[in-house]
Amino acid sequence: MISIYLTDCGRLLEQDQICPGAWIHMSAPNEKEIGRVCAQLHVDPDLVRASLDEEERSRIEQENGTTLILVDTPVVDNDGHATYYSTIPFGIILTGENIITVCLKDVA
């Protein structure tokens, strides 16, 4: 799922299209969504895929004017009998004009 936001007069507004200055949040994106965003913003799709790989470690990586900040974020799973805590990767990709955030799940 892709959500696009733009700040206007101090308010965060949801948008239909990617535009300069927008924040693009990708939650469990499929390959088509990854391809669309990466093609439009000229971002290497591997940076997005790294944010979806549960085995990735936290790091900062720079490539062709784009910066990936990869951190582990906590998640809570409850199976009805017990509560489990773990971490999943959360990617922040900075381009010249946009911010892309990527995660396997919705994290509140």
Q: What function would you assign to each model-found segment?
A:
Residues M1-A108:
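Peripheral, non-transmembrane regulatory/ligand-interaction domains of membrane transport proteins
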